């Protein structure tokens, strides 16, 4: 095979988001920093979902973070496109922000994009999603956990198929993937391989086996984070940068290599 053709096939494999799935499963780790991205890869993650604002469920990361993450890891990096926390009903100006972020994410090397949008009555916003999917191409697209806020998840899954999404991230429309396990299984059964249904939300080493065995999923999404103490010696604990003192500036949440490895081993035992 010619070298150029080989490179093209490799790039297509990476862009599909399936690189790292050679073991029969794929673990996606959501991260919000370069350190966490590197740790996810070291632990055996097959793909990264790059976000900011994980306490809000994930928002669009800076392009600086994306650029350095792409320089630091080899596994695919899917970029969250979400202009703010809160609901998934977007104004015209917010849509313009999303479109601009998609263009920039592609420019800075994103391997895939992750987004979702709903109408006011809890249905997939077909018109908006279709235009965003077209803008994302040729990269693969994931519909994120906006799916868990839809009025009719079974109908919504079929809508995502017609719009061209390759996968959907879901907790089964419940507070966690474990709580939503019955619906996740129904969705995977309905999908019949036409779209990847990826469980996510509260997945840990304590429940991963049950979720994989109970759903039939071959991809899953987790954060696998631990708290790391700040290196600051001088500390003013009476000041918080956010709205609450509950989250200390002197405790940092980062992806834990050991946790990722443990989840990887559990998935191997179940699926390989």
UniProtKB/Swiss-Prot annotation:
<dbReference type="GO" id="GO:0005730">
    <property type="term" value="C:nucleolus"/>
</dbReference>
<keyword id="KW-0539">Nucleus</keyword>
<dbReference type="GO" id="GO:0005507">
    <property type="term" value="F:copper ion binding"/>
</dbReference>
<keyword id="KW-0186">Copper</keyword>
<protein>
    <recommendedName>
        <fullName>Copper homeostasis protein cutC homolog</fullName>
    </recommendedName>
</protein>
<dbReference type="GO" id="GO:0051262">
    <property type="term" value="P:protein tetramerization"/>
</dbReference>
<keyword id="KW-0479">Metal-binding</keyword>
<dbReference type="GO" id="GO:0005829">
    <property type="term" value="C:cytosol"/>
</dbReference>
<dbReference type="GO" id="GO:0005654">
    <property type="term" value="C:nucleoplasm"/>
</dbReference>
<comment type="function">
    <text>May play a role in copper homeostasis. Can bind one Cu(1+) per subunit.</text>
</comment>
<dbReference type="Pfam" id="PF03932">
    <property type="entry name" value="CutC"/>
</dbReference>
<dbReference type="InterPro" id="IPR005627">
    <property type="entry name" value="CutC-like"/>
</dbReference>
<comment type="subunit">
    <text>Homotetramer.</text>
</comment>
<keyword id="KW-0963">Cytoplasm</keyword>
<comment type="similarity">
    <text>Belongs to the CutC family.</text>
</comment>
<dbReference type="InterPro" id="IPR036822">
    <property type="entry name" value="CutC-like_dom_sf"/>
</dbReference>
